[in-house]
Amino acid sequence: MPLPQKKRWESMAKGLVLGALFTSFLLLLYSYAVPPLYTGLASTTPEGAAPCSPAPREPEAPTSANGSAGGCQPRRDIVFMKTHKTASSTLLNILFRFGQKHGLKFAFPNGRNDFDYPAFFARSLVQDYRPGACFNIICNHMRFHYDEVRGLVAPNATFITVLRDPARLFESSFHYFGSVVPFTWKLSGRDKLAEFLQDPDRYYDARGYNAHYLRNLLFFDLGYDSDLDPSSPQVQEHILEVERHFHLVLLQEYFDESLVLLKDLLCWELEDVLYFKLNARRASAVPRLSGELYRRATAWNVLDARLYRHFNASFWRKVEAFGRERMAREVAALRRANERMRRICIDGGRAVDAAAIEDSAMQPWQPLGAKSILGYNLKKSIGQRHAQLCRRMLTPEIQYLMDLGANLWITKLWKFIRDFLRW
């Protein structure tokens, strides 16, 4: 073989070897960053770990935030079970701001922005955890384990979560996470969602890597078997258990009404629940679900559908108890306040594509292989009174976690690799 050609083949061989080694490293890193699915409730927390022992707190001045005659004291011990694709990042921002404003103690994951999801939550996964440690707010993604979470917060902590119409949630999850669910790679048509829903059993394998993202994701996030037989009595038992564990279940479709109920429950002020939509997709990235596809998606996610129906009914009972007219007044007040903040804070008054975001600190996390998540540009001239609040309201989840002191070395390393490879 001529010498130049031999050198070219040697160079190609070295490139292939280096490429194989680098790919292996990425797979190893990803397997560490996204742990395998555990179906049991085995905990990594040592047996007999001491429960939370909160220190006595100085009594606070009562507030009349909710219009009650005697006033009430704001609640500061909160567990937010952060479900996927439910506007939960917007709720997270609300909790981050409240905790930061009042100097509260967050239970953060150690190394990444979730608690080793999809593994079950365990106390030992909390950054700087020590037996007996007590936290005010737990709010990052996890697979819920009530007993483990309960051991980290005060006995009177408020538990909340948020649900979404299961068909809409499935569509969002399918497009956001589909690239990391290998069995979807077999889908070849232009409309992969429609192709999948034509015959989901042909593609779906409950044992497949990241399969949980594409069936009954709410049920899974809440700690239950997402492939449970719909006729099993356990389904209703699990739904009733959720009702016992959570003081309020919010609904994404009625987000403003949900925040009014949350404000009332927690005895917070209106400013505490102001928000901008975070982690939202651009309109062109949201396909329409036709009537037939909607029906198929609902049937495929039947456990989530039963869960949602149950809490949709209980939600409106809470609204009735709150008072329809009072609810309408408070929703209107919230929307006026949000609109005022939009005019004060947001350059151009609306969300923009990732490419149009000028400050890297405002860049939201994007799904693998896409730039579909919108973000914001902060106005350059904001009065001193609102400057801090505006920035906090617009800061994406990952950046806000780092601002609050969370150790995200795995997340940051993964982002560096994605940026380097332009994924």
UniProtKB/Swiss-Prot annotation:
Glycans are attached at residues 66, 156, 312. It comes from the Eukaryota. GO terms for molecular function: galactosylceramide sulfotransferase activity. Residues 48-70 are annotated as: Disordered. Pathway: Lipid metabolism; sphingolipid metabolism. Pfam families: Gal-3-0_sulfotr. It catalyses: a beta-D-galactosyl-(1<->1')-N-acylsphing-4-enine + 3'-phosphoadenylyl sulfate = an N-acyl-1-beta-D-(3-O-sulfo)-galactosyl-sphing-4-enine + adenosine 3',5'-bisphosphate + H(+); a 1-O-alkyl-2-acyl-3-O-(beta-D-galactosyl)-sn-glycerol + 3'-phosphoadenylyl sulfate = a 1-O-alkyl-2-acyl-3-(beta-D-3-sulfogalactosyl)-sn-glycerol + adenosine 3',5'-bisphosphate + H(+); a beta-D-Gal-(1<->1')-ceramide + 3'-phosphoadenylyl sulfate = 1-(3-O-sulfo-beta-D-galactosyl)-ceramide + adenosine 3',5'-bisphosphate + H(+); a 1,2-diacyl-3-O-(beta-D-galactosyl)-sn-glycerol + 3'-phosphoadenylyl sulfate = 1,2-diacyl-3-(3-O-sulfo-beta-D-galactosyl)-sn-glycerol + adenosine 3',5'-bisphosphate + H(+). Residues 36-423 are lumenal. It is a single-pass type II membrane protein. Its main location: Golgi. InterPro entries: Gal-3-0_sulfotransfrase, P-loop_NTPase. GO terms for biological process: galactosylceramide biosynthetic process; galactosylceramide metabolic process; glycerolipid metabolic process; myelination; sphingolipid metabolic process. Belongs to the galactose-3-O-sulfotransferase family. This is Galactosylceramide sulfotransferase. It comes from Bos taurus. The lineage of its organism: Eukaryota, Metazoa, Chordata, Craniata, Vertebrata.
